């Protein structure tokens, strides 16, 4: 077989896989669970848990949104804020809410113990401080803005489906070029690769998807699974928590959440690079797995685009399948469609560079976030 024949074979394989991925994306778009913004769940105690570290620019808007959502909760509800040794005005700003609103409690976090990472430790302290009578716990990140219907809709989804953990995926706000290239890959990555309804039921670790930006969990199952103590050394603690829930017989997974919450994870290219540098390596488990996944993505979503430029019809089919898959996800999650989806192959290449950067930082021990080295599990 000549080099040309081998190239054409790779193009055909990539295009076929892209078409198959598009089919799965369309299926998931039709079956993806969606919170009902008008839902009114059965009244039960709710505790919202908000870990914050150097979030002075976010905590005010975040708490305003949380309190508006608590107004719509039919049962008793409150929010506990844990200040995780902030060096800015985060604690003072949060304390002002506690003075004005009895539903807000602010506690000071203690230093991260050996063997723990910062966020799992903060969440574990919050959960320990929550009332044991709470029926539902909702973990929220400070860069998330929930809608007034968010907690009622999320709680109703949890109870009506019989699941033990639901992760309504917020709309991912992306403003700069770097954000627009990378952030849409978050929802696309699971909508294009996993059969989501099956993923809810199976205990296979590789089929667990969750997003710690907004997690709604049954309090009893959370404690039975070991809570964040069970995931204390995990960089990607949200997915690890879902796996812990499944390990004790629970069920759960990701749902659409763009109508009830929005999040801008990173503001610009530098923040985006630093954020993925500290965590992306943990998504693969090993360097060889990272190379395999990125290589497969290149074959499926970059090779066809290159071949298309050379006049390959198989390449055109593969490119259009990838772009259409992205468009379906964007339409489903209220993201930006055009012209962003046309740059899908470039997004994949940028993701590959971020993955390499993260793997190098992990190997060198230079992965850091908010002044802390991400070193557990190295």
State where each predicted segment sits.
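N-terminal membrane-anchoring/stem segments of glycan-assembly enzymes
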Residues: 1-42, 183-184, 192-196, 330, ...
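Long helical/loop segments within the catalytic core of UDP-sugar-dependent glycosyltransferases
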Residues: 28, 105-130, 153-216, 220-224, ...
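Cell-envelope/extracellular polymer assembly enzymes that use nucleotide-activated donors
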Residues: 45-47, 78
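Short, acidic, metal-binding catalytic loop of nucleotide-sugar glycosyltransferases
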Residues: 64-76
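A conserved acidic beta->alpha catalytic loop
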Residues: 83-93, 110-111
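Acidic donor-binding/catalytic loop of UDP-sugar-dependent glycosyltransferases
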Residues: 89, 140-157
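Catalytic donor/gating beta->alpha subdomain of glycosyltransferases that bind UDP-sugars
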Residues: 158, 167-190, 220-223, 228-289, ...
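Membrane-embedded multi-pass helical conduit in multi-pass membrane proteins
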Residues: 289-366
């Amino acid at each position: 077989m000549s080099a040309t024949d081998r190239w054409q074979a790779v193009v055909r394989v990539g295009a076929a896989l892209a078409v198959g991925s598009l089919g799965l994306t369309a299926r998931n778009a039709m079956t993806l669970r969606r919170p009902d913004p008008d839902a009114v769940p059965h009244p039960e105690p709710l505790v919202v848990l908000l870990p914050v570290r150097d979030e002075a620019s976010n905590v005010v808007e975040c708490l305003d949104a949380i309190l508006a959502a608590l107004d719509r909760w039919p049962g008793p509800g409150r929010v506990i804020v844990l200040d995780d040794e902030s060096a800015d005005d985060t604690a003072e700003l949060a304390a002002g809410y506690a003075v004005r609103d009895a539903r807000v409690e602010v506690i000071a976090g203690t230093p991260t113990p050996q063997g723990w990472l910062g966020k799992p430790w903060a969440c574990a302290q919050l959960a320990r401080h929550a009332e044991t009578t709470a029926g539902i716990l909702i973990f929220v990140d400070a860069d998330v803005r929930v809608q007034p219907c968010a907690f009622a809709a999320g709680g109703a989804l949890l109870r009506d489906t019989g699941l033990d953990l639901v992760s309504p995926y917020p709309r991912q706000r992306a403003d700069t070029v770097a954000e627009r290239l990378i952030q849409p890959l978050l929802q696309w990555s699971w909508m294009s690769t996993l059969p989501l309804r099956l993923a809810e039921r199976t205990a296979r670790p590789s089929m667990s998807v969750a997003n710690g930006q907004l997690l709604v969990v049954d309090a009893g199952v959370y404690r039975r699974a070991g809570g964040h103590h069970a995931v204390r050394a995990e960089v990607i603690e949200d997915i690890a928590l879902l796996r812990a829930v499944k390990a004790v017989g629970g069920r759960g997974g990701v749902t659409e959440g763009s109508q009830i919450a929005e999040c801008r994870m990173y503001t610009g290219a530098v923040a985006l690079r630093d954020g993925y540098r500290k965590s992306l390596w943990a998504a693969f488990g090993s360097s060889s797995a990272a190379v395999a996944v990125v290589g497969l993505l290149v074959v499926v979503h970059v090779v066809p685009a290159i071949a298309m430029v050379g006049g390959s019809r198989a390449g055109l089919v593969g490119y259009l399948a990838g772009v259409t898959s992205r468009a379906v996800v964007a339409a489903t999650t209220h993201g930006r469609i055009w012209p962003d989806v046309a740059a899908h192959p470039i997004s994949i290449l940028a993701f590959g560079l971020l993955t390499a950067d993260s793997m190098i930082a992990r190997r060198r021990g230079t992965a850091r976030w908010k002044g802390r080295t991400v070193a557990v599990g190295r």
